[in-house]
Design a protein with these regions (language model features):
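A short, aliphatic-rich alpha-helical micro-motif
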Residues: 60, 169-170
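Structured loop/turn residues at beta-strand edges in well-structured enzyme cores
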Residues: 103, 170-171
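Metallocofactor- and cofactor-centric catalytic cores in central/energy metabolism, strongly enriched
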Residues: 1-163
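Conserved small/polar residues in nucleotide/adenosyl-binding loops
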Residues: 175-177
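Residue-level signal for threonine
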Residues: 166
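Short, well-ordered alpha-helix to beta-strand connector turns
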Residues: 63, 172-173
Length: 177
């Protein structure tokens, strides 16, 4: 069994399967202290100094329409210092410093073909502060792979597979995943 979403998922694996359990089968690598301030500062340093692209402070500006794409609940991470909560707060702070207005920011859960993220899951993932900052104004949504009014047809692959993209993501000027 392994962690999946909010529970455990069982699977039968061949005897030859190598199973990696962090901290058990292999020692955990050294990591940052897990307090909010340490994680926030380390994340901010990374966001301000990205590899291979300009920092948000140069990409975003007043009038930018921004979406922040967030993994769904299947990816876990509901603790107070979860990477999602820390990185979203850092990104928001950087966007605000660059002149982006709150009303121009959308948070979208990227659940792919999983069921849509419901309101209760959104609040669990984001925590009360982030949820209450954006949900009342309608600035949190969930991708819906069956809502063709909010999908953009980008054509097909060389094999003929359709390529569809979420319209909210397609229409925005700055996307941060």
């Amino acid at each position: 069994e392994f962690e999946y979403g909010q529970g455990l998922l069982g699977a039968e694996l061949p005897d030859s399967t190598d199973i990696f359990i962090p901290g058990e089968t292999v020692a955990d690598p050294p990591c940052l202290p897990q307090d909010w301030d340490s994680l926030y500062e380390a994340t901010k340093k990374s966001v301000q100094n990205p590899i291979g692209m300009e920092p948000l402070s140069k990409l975003a500006h007043k009038g930018s329409k921004v979406t922040i794409v967030i993994p769904d609940i299947v990816k876990g991470g509901l603790q107070e210092t979860a990477h999602r909560r820390v990185s979203i707060r850092v990104i928001l702070d950087e966007l605000y410093k660059a002149g982006v207005e709150k009303r121009d920011i959308l948070l979208i859960f990227s659940n792919g073909l999983h069921p849509r993220t419901n309101v209760e899951e959104m609040q669990k993932i984001l925590g009360d502060a982030l949820f209450n900052e954006f949900y009342p104004s309608g600035q949190i949504t969930s991708h819906d792979s069956e809502d063709y009014d909010h999908l953009v047809d980008l054509g097909t692959t060389d094999r003929g597979d359709p390529v569809l993209m979420n319209k909210y993501v397609y229409d925005l000027s700055l996307i941060h995943i």
